[in-house]
Amino acid sequence: MYKRQAQSASNPKRPQRETRLLKTLLWVHTTLWKVLFGFPADNLERSTESDRFDECAYCATLTADMITTNTPLFSRGMSVPKEMEQLSVEAYTAGIVEGALEGLGFPARVTAHTVSTDAYPDRTTILIKLDRSVMERETAMGGP
């Protein structure tokens, strides 16, 4: 006899779009990153250091979510001339993340920044500044 399956996010035949911010960011950090690059991103964190970010009308608060990858895909195969060292070739990755978040209903301004370390000279942080509407919705749903 035919059993009707309950609609849930874990049902691949009837997936639901996630409406909570943290779960969406975790999806980008793991699932989307694995599909695009073959491995999950190295780190997902939230910064609340107000002196690190420019205040803008678009941004919800002076907090930002960051996805870090120690060995970014596009930086591996490209060499940037010294006169263009401010160029971040991972801006393409930031655009993909921004498009994914926009498509999921989480508008944000997403940028890429190289944060070199001795161990990882191409280490890149994808900085996510969410739209005010996202944070208002998250607060209304009982989030942070």
Where are these regions (language model features)?
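Mixed-charge, glycine-accented linear interaction segment located at domain edges/termini
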Residues: 94-107, 111
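Intrinsic disorder
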Residues: 84-91, 120
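Eukaryote-biased feature marking scaffold/signaling PDZ-domain proteins and nuclear chromatin regulators
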Residues: 92, 105, 121-123
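A generic structural signal for short, solvent-exposed coil/turn residues
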Residues: 52, 102-104, 118-120
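Beta-rich nucleic-acid/ligand-interaction surfaces
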Residues: 112-128
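A broad, low-specificity signal marking well-ordered, structured residues that form hydrophobic/aromatic
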Residues: 58, 65-66, 108, 124-126
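N-terminal accessory segment detector
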Residues: 1-87, 133-144
